[in-house]
Amino acid sequence: MRYMHYYTQKASVPEEQWAAFKSKLKLAFNNLPDSSTSAGGFYKDCPITLCYGPGKQGVRKADKLFVTGQGNDFTGEATWFNGDRLVGHEAQSFILPNVFDPENQKWMHCNTECKPYDWFVVTALILIHHEAPGCFEISSDGRREHWEPVIRWLAPVVGHELTLPQAVDGVGERYYPDSFENRLVGLPSFHF
């Protein structure tokens, strides 16, 4: 099943913004839910398991989500992970670098095939959209309702308001750390 996320890099992520992204992605990793309801919830009964790069060895510590320069793949630092190959939950590796290299853009998309690690791919894309606005142009085959479970979980984890990328949401809806406020998002106004 094809289910793509696109993230064309437009600029290098400034050091301070990359550090904030890393910190929040590690926090999200340490608070992962047991299963994924993103991407239409096709794997809602399967655990979210992240593995290094190609999906062979499990990530146990959040620091292991990040690697430095991998030759022809990217320069600088990147988050690089996949689903678990041992149980058939891997698809295309997700690589998100901090350094813009116009000559090497082959990883500007990730086909998660709706597998459980899609949850964390969406998490990373929401966080980089928030922490480094303008550095990536983000879109997806998924619709707003496919990303909503992730952002509703993520806003309380990081403790501040978040928005989805414009190409996914279209309306700029805000999601808040308070779960009560999140329930109010999208409700009709009764003011006449």
Question: Where are these predicted regions, by residue range?
Answer:
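Acidic (Asp/Glu-rich) sequence patches and key acidic residues
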Residues: M1-H191
